[in-house]
Amino acid sequence: MARGKAKEEGSWKKFIWNSEKKEFLGRTGGSWFKILLFYVIFYGCLAGIFIGTIQVMLLTISEFKPTYQDRVAPPGLTQIPQIQKTEISFRPNDPKSYEAYVLNIVRFLEKYKDSAQRDDMIFEDCGDVPSEPKERGDFNHERGERKVCRFKLEWLGNCSGLNDETYGYKEGKPCIIIKLNRVLGFKPKPPKNESLETYPVMKYNPNVLPVQCTGKRDEDKDKVGNVEYFGLGNSPGFPLQYYPYYGKLLQPKYLQPLLAVQFTNLTMDTEIRIECKAYGENIGYSEKDRFQGRFDVKIEVKS
């Protein structure tokens, strides 16, 4: 038994290193060199094919614009102040209750101050009235960075913060700022005039993507009260000269056009659900994404 065990151990040792044939694990040094060389060449070729494929693919991709945009969803519509539960609840006589909302608006509007838009090499005036989309060439680096349209805070009227630092919250007339999320190369198409006949509040303008805020539910519609809109040219929507957006590489200082909405006569001590919606031929809505082309927010002004 012991002799058989010793013989077995000897055979394993001999397999690991055979001193007679100079073999390690059954192969000579030359054999090991050849097999290692084979695998180095084999995996080197695989790596070369992989890297070559990636390089060819990268040649078809622009760093300035996606090659395929047919499946990009229409832009979302969002509001400031940005709140987690989309609920705004405050007491006009209690500054602490609306302090967070005001600070959120102040921080967002910092980049829209005149002092932040003085560089004429970056910013340019695009007019005080809505106009057609402003094309700035192809999506490449040949012309360098593209200029950006200025947007003046004064266009936001009562919601600009220039005359009322509480943006209406102190008076129980809250403001929200609405923006259309950035989508590279997107040019809004306003709805046709006849499609707005069911929305008497909205006036047709071929150079404005209109937005309307109303009560979400039937029981909310009579509680919303008067709604005032403030934007470029006093238009309730987004002017087209701020589009298309050329991306962070070509327009790092891009400013989205804003629309301010003020609710001046909300029913007190009532939670009101309000829906704000953009209207356009290429604006879509989705039940899976509640911010695609629209959003709703609950507002309660407590006494």
Curated annotation (Swiss-Prot):
GO cellular component: apical plasma membrane; basolateral plasma membrane; caveola; extracellular exosome; extracellular vesicle; intercalated disc; lateral plasma membrane; membrane
Positions glycosylated per UniProt: N158, N193, N265
Tissue expression summary: Found in most tissues.
GO terms classed as biological process: ATP metabolic process; cardiac muscle contraction; cell adhesion; cell communication by electrical coupling involved in cardiac conduction; establishment or maintenance of transmembrane electrochemical gradient; innate immune response; intracellular calcium ion homeostasis; intracellular potassium ion homeostasis
InterPro entries recorded: Na/K_ATPase_sub_beta, Na/K_ATPase_sub_beta_sf
Signal peptide: none
GO molecular function: ATPase activator activity; ATPase binding; MHC class II protein complex binding; P-type sodium:potassium-exchanging transporter activity; protein heterodimerization activity; protein kinase binding; protein-macromolecule adaptor activity; transporter activator activity
Extracellular side: 63-303
Cytoplasmic-facing ranges: 1-34
Membrane topology: Single-pass type II membrane protein
Keyword flag tRNA processing: no
Cross-referenced Pfam families: Na_K-ATPase (PF00287)
Keyword line: Cell adhesion, Cell membrane, Disulfide bond, Glutathionylation, Glycoprotein, Immunity, Innate immunity, Ion transport, Membrane, Phosphoprotein, Potassium, Potassium transport, Signal-anchor, Sodium, Sodium transport, Sodium/potassium transport, Transmembrane, Transmembrane helix, Transport
Keyword Transmembrane helix: yes
Principal cellular location given in the protein's record: membrane
Function: This is the non-catalytic component of the active enzyme, which catalyzes the hydrolysis of ATP coupled with the exchange of Na(+) and K(+) ions across the plasma membrane. The beta subunit regulates, through assembly of alpha/beta heterodimers, the number of sodium pumps transported to the plasma membrane. Plays a role in innate immunity by enhancing virus-triggered induction of interferons (IFNs) and interferon stimulated genes (ISGs). Mechanistically, enhances the ubiquitination of TRAF3 and TRAF6 as well as the phosphorylation of TAK1 and TBK1. Involved in cell adhesion and establishing epithelial cell polarity.
Protein known as: Sodium/potassium-transporting ATPase subunit beta-1
Species the sequence originates in: Homo sapiens
